[in-house]
Amino acid sequence: MEAPDYEVLSVREQLFHERIRECIISTLLFATLYILCHIFLTRFKKPAEFTTVDDEDATVNKIALELCTFTLAIALGAVLLLPFSIISNEVLLSLPRNYYIQWLNGSLIHGLWNLVFLFSNLSLIFLMPFAYFFTESEGFAGSRKGVLGRVYETVVMLMLLTLLVLGMVWVASAIVDKNKANRESLYDFWEYYLPYLYSCISFLGVLLLLVCTPLGLARMFSVTGKLLVKPRLLEDLEEQLYCSAFEEAALTRRICNPTSCWLPLDMELLHRQVLALQTQRVLLEKRRKASAWQRNLGYPLAMLCLLVLTGLSVLIVAIHILELLIDEAAMPRGMQGTSLGQVSFSKLGSFGAVIQVVLIFYLMVSSVVGFYSSPLFRSLRPRWHDTAMTQIIGNCVCLLVLSSALPVFSRTLGLTRFDLLGDFGRFNWLGNFYIVFLYNAAFAGLTTLCLVKTFTAAVRAELIRAFGLDRLPLPVSGFPQASRKTQHQ
């Protein structure tokens, strides 16, 4: 064999080993996420749905739970996708020729983006509808009962739903795109219609993030205040403990002497209220035993960090709005190449990259808090060991929509300069200047409005409490009308 043949063979072997290495790394990453999500979901599922007398229902719920675990793992991978890419780029810049990080390259990052895009499509369009129809199915009338009968019914329902969605996407694309070939042909399903459908879903996710993130940024202050121990100047734990003990004693007296009240009592409701008060009293005892460092330093530092992160997010978006008006390069776009480690995506270098990662995670947590705080989705909020299977499916779908839109959301707001890889950069609406500009302006305006409203309401409540106006008796709404009637008489 000649020397050129050896060179060709060595290049092929190297490409083969790199491909195998990427597959192993991707599999290990997904397995880790899958195990974490499975542990997380088992803490919220209803144990009664998996230990029923009917083995068929238990089997169906177990299969649906595995599909939900897969979907939630993909959602978590979508959240980690952009931060992992930014950190990888900075690591390659700092250690360009290190032997121990040869596995970290542009091909691996690009492959992870493509896998997340593929499995997000698969979960949203096929797996989650299959899981929902599978849990609700009973088999066709006249067919034999069993899991296989449910599978047949679910597959038929899924095929009908696929045809319906495909027809709607075809009509929508024909209306938006005036190209006659797209109206007459359905052959380019994988190349055009499926990415177009995911583009619509991603756009809905970005709009959902636009609504939920400002609300979550405002709610983060109150949520953090409930989790941390406030200074004694801001809360009186002794008074709360006294009130809790007094209410518990009153409810216990009602339970022990039900004949003392002439109204019928709901004993089950009273027992639940007593248990809730006992749990609240235990939490208050723990908060009272907190150290002075936790009480006087932890809460102010946490509030200061939240205020800095929120203000920094609004400032970056405001700067990005000005850049959109001046420079066309500020528009979000896709990156087809896989070369990383060439240039930093932050003007501040590694420090700026760390700030970008922290802001991305902060906005994602805020969007989840805002999502579950909104009145429309509050009923979806999972409960510890008391969440139905259909509710778990709904939560997984919503979290996947939010997380898969996070890279587009971050790049649209200018939180990072890292361009979108793979099919994430092929969305049609990303090139529309008016959509991107209005989106940035709406985010900055809504976030500022929510923060101003939250802080003014908090300051107003503290002033009312400080002046003792909260102890004043409130006027009865019907009293003035009654006085007028007596005057006329």
Swiss-Prot record:
Pfam families linked to this entry: LMBR1 (PF04791)
Single GO cellular component term: plasma membrane
Parts of the chain that traverse the membrane: 22-42, 67-87, 115-135, 155-175, 197-217, 306-326, 351-371, 389-409, 432-452
Quaternary structure note: Dimer. Can also form higher oligomers. Interacts with LCN1; this interaction mediates the endocytosis of LCN1. Interacts with UBAC2, FAF2, VCP, AMFR, ZNRF3, CTNNB1, LRP6, GSK3A and GSK3B. Interacts with DVL2 and RNF43. Interaction with SCGB1A1 has been observed in PubMed:16423471, but not in PubMed:23964685. Interaction with LGB which mediates the endocytosis of LGB has been observed in PubMed:17991420, but not in PubMed:23964685.
Organism: Homo sapiens (Human)
Principal localisation: membrane
Similarity comment: family membership: Belongs to the LIMR family.
Name of this protein: Protein LMBR1L
Region (Interaction with LGB): 1-59
Subcellular location per the Swiss-Prot or TrEMBL entry: Cell membrane; Endoplasmic reticulum membrane
